[in-house]
């Protein structure tokens, strides 16, 4: 049965704030265990093993755009792909991964997708979120409940 909505978290939890999408997905999955919520880590292509997809998908990830750390960004996929910050994304890179999914996965193309991103402060060790990014993640967590 196809879920009405779902959430995936993306990022590298071993790289500080870059793991904020995974952190949020894990927290939401514990809060809503029966919902379609998954932590994909740094490999967005793993989503193909999770079919059937929900009708609407919220993708959670980190962003480095120069805005205040912890700031929340709501971007369309097209606008995100135009951003120069996508070069250091996950796996093949965000553009490559989305391009591959769009070319090979008809079901993925039919999903309504929304990106919710949190501005990072640091992407390195230690393996914890910085306080400002955690505050932004807490704010987004409350919005998604």
Question: Where are these predicted regions, by residue range?
Answer:
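N-terminal catalytic or cofactor-binding beta/alpha core of small enzyme domains
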Residues: 1-122, 127-138, 143-145
């Amino acid at each position: 049965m196809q879920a009405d909505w779902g959430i995936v978290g993306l990022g590298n939890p071993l790289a500080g704030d870059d793991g904020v999408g995974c952190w949020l997905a894990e927290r939401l999955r514990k809060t809503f265990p029966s919902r379609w919520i998954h932590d994909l880590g740094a490999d967005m292509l793993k989503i193909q093993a999770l079919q059937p997809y929900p009708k609407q998908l919220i993708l959670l990830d980190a962003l480095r755009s120069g805005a205040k750390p912890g700031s929340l960004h709501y971007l369309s996929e097209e606008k995100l792909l135009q951003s120069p910050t996508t070069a250091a994304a996950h796996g093949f890179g965000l553009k490559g991964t989305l391009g591959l999914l769009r070319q090979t996965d008809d079901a993925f193309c039919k999903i309504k997708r929304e990106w919710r991103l949190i501005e990072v402060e640091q992407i390195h060790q230690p393996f914890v979120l910085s306080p400002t990014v955690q505050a932004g993640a807490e704010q987004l967590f409350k919005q998604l409940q």
